[in-house]
């Protein structure tokens, strides 16, 4: 096992770390790198957290796909077969979209392009008190 050490602002690497994807036909693994703003700007600073996916891709010598969309890893769940679950309360929240409500069609388009999912199941909200 290899251990990679990096400074972070917060311990929740599930939310700010890389999301790994695997090509169904080639088996090639890559990293997706989303913007991170510490759960809608609640816990500044987040600059070190936001840098982790890029550092991981470099350390692991993996291809990295970047997105300008703000996303925490804990805000989505996939089954690896094309379906993704998420909540409107998080992914469409104005604190992830520059103060304006997110556009569901645009968010879906980006999730599908970056993660290769086909179906997205939206819930209105998640568990009370869970920021992701």
Over which residues does each language-model region extend?
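The feature marks the mature, well-folded catalytic cores of soluble enzymes
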Residues: 1-132
